[in-house]
Amino acid sequence: MAATTTTMMGMATTFVPKPQAPPMMAALPSNTGRSLFGLKTGSRGGRMTMAAYKVTLVTPTGNVEFQCPDDVYILDAAEEEGIDLPYSCRAGSCSSCAGKLKTGSLNQDDQSFLDDDQIDEGWVLTCAAYPVSDVTIETHKEEELTA
């Protein structure tokens, strides 16, 4: 490493070049075939894919079906499809959006209203439930849940 010294009337100043900082993050490979942050990369363009499941809602006016990603609440996905479902708090702390799970599996970890026994009986709050498989849910069940 080269240094330059300058003297002026008895004072000396030394200039040392600043070392180059290493790069903060190496580039990620485009497609390694391994999971990246829990998601798998695709074979074209390194796109990541997320699971989406078929949700069938049994409503008072008939059955409706739509696809719901595994990271979107069922109530939110239904609204995006133009399906009108009851709700109030949107936080899993009331029972306005209550339904009854008929088939499939859900993740309801974000809700705080239902107890474990109610979940085991199939009760679901659509505002705080993610699908983890294809599901069928009877909607508009608040009165039945709270009776």
Curated annotation (Swiss-Prot):
InterPro entries: 2Fe-2S_ferredoxin-like_sf, 2Fe-2S_ferredoxin-type, 2Fe2S_fd_BS, Beta-grasp_dom_sf, Fd_pln. GO terms for molecular function: 2 iron, 2 sulfur cluster binding; electron transfer activity; metal ion binding. It holds the Pfam family Fer2. One of its GO terms (biological process) is electron transport chain. The keyword ATP-binding does not apply. Binds 1 [2Fe-2S] cluster. Residues 1-50 form a transit peptide. Its main location: plastid. [2Fe-2S] cluster binds at C89, C94, C97, C127. It is found in: Plastid, Chloroplast. Keywords: 2Fe-2S, Chloroplast, Electron transport, Iron, Iron-sulfur, Metal-binding, Plastid, Transit peptide, Transport. Residues 53-143 form the 2Fe-2S ferredoxin-type domain. It comes from the Eukaryota. Ferredoxins are iron-sulfur proteins that transfer electrons in a wide variety of metabolic reactions. Belongs to the 2Fe2S plant-type ferredoxin family. Forms a complex with heterodimeric ferredoxin-thioredoxin reductase (FTR) and thioredoxin. This is Ferredoxin-1, chloroplastic. It comes from Spinacia oleracea (Spinach). The lineage of its organism: Eukaryota, Viridiplantae, Streptophyta, Embryophyta, Tracheophyta.
